[in-house]
A protein has these predicted regions:
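Membrane helical hairpin/interfacial module
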Residues: 9-13, 26-30
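Catalytic-core segments of class I nucleotidyltransferases/pyrophosphorylases
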Residues: 79, 98-102, 129-180
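Conserved beta-loop-beta/alpha segment of the NTase-like Rossmann-fold superfamily
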Residues: 26-29, 36-129, 170
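Short acidic/polar active-site loop segments enriched in Thr and Asp
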Residues: 3-4, 76
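Glycine-rich loop at the start of a catalytic domain that most often binds anionic cofactors/ligands
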Residues: 17-24
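Short internal beta-strands
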Residues: 4-9, 110-111
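Small/polar loops that bind or transfer phosphate-bearing groups
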Residues: 8-9, 54, 157
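A conserved hydrophobic position in a structured secondary element of the catalytic/binding core
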Residues: 11, 81, 89, 160-161
Length: 180
């Protein structure tokens, strides 16, 4: 399971660190009001995982943010979860991805189908069908021109990535907008 969380932040994002920090004030207030059950829940949450932060010096894209984590990650596979996608499912998305990783032992992307007319709003995969909910990705197309998308299967902001990505990112030239 996941025991450590690394959050890549940028300039003026101190509130993210504050949000996930231990809340001494809240614990004190709950204790003073005799709300011991809630106090235990709050304390248990703060002990669930260790959270670390690395600041991305410039906003140079997702690839650069992932590359910032290389010394923290080492040589283990890792999960990437982008905060701008909310996934609500009976089986949590990350659990599904971890199960797929255990079976295939390779980088896993979370995907979803989108209406063809909305494909230009997403990164879209060009892939070969393997079995239900499993595709072998040939290519990724970021926000394709309307009508030119290879499929209507969009990349969700959830990934399990192998550490080989760091070698690829190290040699990756910046793309559109200077992003990696």
């Amino acid at each position: 399971g996941i025991e450590e969380i690394l959050i890549i932040t940028g300039k003026n994002k101190k509130s993210i660190e504050d949000h996930f920090d231990k809340s001494v004030e809240l614990e004190l207030e709950l204790e003073q009001k005799g709300k011991t059950e809630l106090l235990e829940i709050v304390r248990d949450i703060s002990q669930m995982v260790n959270i670390y932060y690395i600041r991305q010096k410039e906003p140079k894209g997702l690839g650069d943010a992932i590359y910032c984590a290389r010394s923290f990650i080492g040589d283990e596979p890792f999960a990437v979860m982008l905060g701008d996608d909310i996934v609500d499912n009976d089986v949590p998305c990350l659990k599904q991805l971890m199960s797929a990783y255990e079976e295939y032992r390779t980088t896993i992307l979370g995907v979803q189908t989108v209406a063809p007319e909305d494909a230009n709003k997403y990164g879209i995969i060009n892939a070969r069908y393997i079995e239900d909910n499993v595709y072998k990705v040939k290519d990724l197309v970021e926000k394709p021109e309307p009508g030119k998308q290879p499929s209507n299967i969009a990349i969700l902001g959830r990934y399990i990535i192998t550490p080989e990505i760091f070698e690829i990112l190290e040699n990756q030239a910046p793309g559109k907008g200077g992003e990696v």
